[in-house]
Amino acid sequence: MSAIFRNSDKERAAREAYLQLAAAADEFEQYANPHAVRIAAIADKIAEAFHLAPQDRKSLRTAARMHDLGEVAMERDYIQRAGSLTDEERIDLERHPVIGEQEAARASANRDVQLLVRWHHEWWNGDGYPDALRQNEIPLAARILRVADSYAALTDARPYRPAMTEEDARTQIIERAAIEFDPAVVNVLLSLHDLEELRSFAKPVDPLADTTTTDDGWNLFSLFMK
């Protein structure tokens, strides 16, 4: 298997520039805490349980750092806006994995990393994008990245919504097993307890606050995963 980044002075410089850009994705998406680094740690721990080869785990960690380069390249204001997306915005946003794949290639990442970036929104039931892959058509590393990305997003705050508790996030993940997520990957996530990156950043709930909502579970999940 090829190196994570093809080696030349020019390509090493491109790699460093794009890893810095990947770190800037957290700022662009306005997560309260380091998002991509957190995903990489969670994904790597799950990959370890599946006995992925060291090189495959390294590719997965790199893809986790770079997975939302497409969103940064698109520079869409709606990503930072409160509320649900319009149908047109949702269709536009679904372009970001392909754009991210192209950006990873420009950074001289190897093909494994490029494809993980492309496929990090594929769903177990085939309803994901951009290629509508399903079940084992999706590489295991991409299925792991999907779960790790979702859990990290649910348990971190953004300006327009709070973080979920660990318990609530796990409930959401369980409910979407065999729909969006590989059930086997979900089971491994649920077995992890001592990893610092699994900690939720949810703040204590004000007992006097109105916590009622008219959103059903799907709309709530969609809001958190924008």
Predicted regions and their residues:
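Histidine- and acidic-residue-rich, metal-dependent catalytic cores
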Residues: 2-226
